[in-house]
């Protein structure tokens, strides 16, 4: 019985995802189906979206995929430094084991 509920939930979520285009307004479908435009066109569309957003949303700025990727690259740099520090600690453990032999 629980397995059936899980299957039904997955089915409903999949149908909702694939039928998303059917409930979007025609103007949004045309925007999505248009070919790749210039960056200026993309920026203008993002600006238009922000124009109808609330004051707080406009303060956050555009949240497109480009900005998301840039944020991820900023977050990955400190991790690399932490990993380099961890290698020194791991090397210390290895050297201690070699000295005991």
Swiss-Prot record:
Phenylalanine amide sites (modified residues): 92
Presence of the UniProt keyword Cell inner membrane in the record: no
Native source species: Mus musculus
Signal peptide, first to last residue: 1-21
InterPro entries per UniProt: GAST, Gastrin/CCK, Gastrin/cholecystokinin_CS
Modification Sulfotyrosine occurs at: 87
Taxonomic superkingdom: Eukaryota
Compartmental location: Secreted
Entry comment describing in which tissues the protein is expressed: Abundantly expressed in the stomach and duodenum. Low levels in brain, ovary and pancreas.
Modification Phosphoserine occurs at: 96
Its biological purpose: Gastrin stimulates the stomach mucosa to produce and secrete hydrochloric acid and the pancreas to secrete its digestive enzymes. It also stimulates smooth muscle contraction and increases blood circulation and water secretion in the stomach and intestine.
Region (Disordered): 23-101
Molecular functions (GO terms): hormone activity
Keyword Signal: yes
Identification of the protein by name: Gastrin
Propiece residue ranges: 96-101
